[in-house]
Amino acid sequence: MKEIKHFINGAFVGSASGRTFEDVNPANGQVIARVHEAGRAEVDAAVQAARAALKGPWGKMSVSERAEILHRVADGITARFDEFLEAECLDTGKPKSLASHIDIPRGAANFKVFADLLKNVATEAFEMATPDGSGAINYAVRRPKGVIGVISPWNLPLLLMTWKVGPALACGNTVVVKPSEETPLTTALLGEVMQAAGVPAGVYNVVHGFGPDSAGAFLTEHPDVNAITFTGETRTGEAIMRAAAKGVRPVSFELGGKNAGIVFADCDLDKAIEGSMRSVFANGGQVCLGTERLYVERPIFDEFVARLKAGAESLVIGTPDDPQANFGPLISLQHREKVLSYYQKAVDEGATVVTGGGVPEMPAELAGGAWVQPTIWTGLADGAAVVTEEIFGPCCHIRPFDREEEAVELANSLPYGLAATIWTENTSRAHRVAGQLEAGIVWVNSWFLRDLRTAFGGSKQSGIGREGGVHSLEFYTELKNICVKL
């Protein structure tokens, strides 16, 4: 059986304790690999290796030299595309058609985009008068923040991990990555690519394990970690924030959400259905930017519900190797239990189950997988659990509205504010409503269109800070002002 070890100081090493845990294929419930669980000793070794690497060749390289190496990392991912694809789909169960189009290409792009971006960032400079008349010049320089603790999620493992590692390394930092215990494969595989690309030992380190009383907690509590970036649940973010408060270390969080979509009667209904199908059901609904609440203007409500129902029922459920499949399992049986508990809550609270609401019949060899049906509800009160709480599954509640102001109020009614979608052909309305929505990202007549130069992050309880483009540089560097008297 495959054995996944930590990657520390340029080498794959096991845990001194010998403790391991199972990595399970969510499509069939079979064990893929045994993964070493890091203790405090392994986490400390990784952090110290990262700290030492800051003073080694990596810390002495120019921006262009680092960029050249990161381009080789990106090329290494592309050269081993099929290996990364197989590993990502084994860990997540997602269709290969999805991972080959989004996850793996973006994993490579995250290194190239940020390497090139940093090469072209201008610095500010100001002349000033001085009391003696000689003058002075102020100019700003960016310096690496230091050792970055990266805690990445399981839904888009390679994409979201490299989204943090790419800019962190481009800025000259070193990293210690704690991937989700559910999806360790591509993070480990990236260690091999880093070695081959000539990344110095200690620059990229990986420790495997869980959160509380395990690698995640040990990493966030470590005093030699200079900053922490995390994607995951709001509750976990709160715990990390408490740990980071000791030492007053900066954090960047992308947290939970309960994203809303607003569909106006003047929309292009074909596009609204296609976009909503993706935003609700893509990746099994396990997308932080996905839509779990849809507000549809009353004149088109019935038609919209009927067409989204037909779309949900047309999804082909299957394994990553099924070329026809476009809907895979959830990440784990544990997560399935959570999602199914909300399916039951919806019924208990009086929902009309438009479609789904249970577990699909699967062949015997897949019976151990974490399968659920795509699900749509209507008829619930605005305060119902499935309307107000993040489920992170392939489901949504659809509610009619009559006035624009009502739709905005409903969309803004929760303590989350990550993303939103608007479907309308009225340009003035699109701009007006987008400006009123309390969300970090608003898509108009689209979903998941991403330009990596733009700001990414959530408002309210959906996050702290922004990453993407120069915003990533603001988090991963310290800005120093130098004043020179003439």
Swiss-Prot record:
Its EC number is 1.2.1.85. PROSITE patterns: ALDEHYDE_DEHYDR_CYS, ALDEHYDE_DEHYDR_GLU. It catalyses: (2Z,4E)-2-hydroxy-6-oxohexa-2,4-dienoate + NAD(+) + H2O = (2Z,4E)-2-hydroxyhexa-2,4-dienedioate + NADH + 2 H(+). Pathway: Aromatic compound metabolism; benzoate degradation via hydroxylation. Keywords: Aromatic hydrocarbons catabolism, NAD, Oxidoreductase, Plasmid. One of its GO terms (molecular function) is oxidoreductase activity, acting on the aldehyde or oxo group of donors, NAD or NADP as acceptor. GO terms for biological process: benzoate catabolic process via hydroxylation. The active site is at E254, C288. InterPro entries: Ald_DH/histidinol_DH, Ald_DH_C, Ald_DH_CS_CYS, Ald_DH_CS_GLU, Ald_DH_N, Aldehyde_DH_dom, OHmuconic_semiald_DH. It comes from the Bacteria. SUPFAM superfamilies: ALDH-like. 2-hydroxymuconic acid semialdehyde can be converted to 2-hydroxypent-2,4-dienoate either directly by the action of 2-hydroxymuconic semialdehyde hydrolase (HMSH) or by the action of three sequential enzymes, the first of which is HMSD. This is 2-hydroxymuconic semialdehyde dehydrogenase. It comes from Pseudomonas sp. (strain CF600).
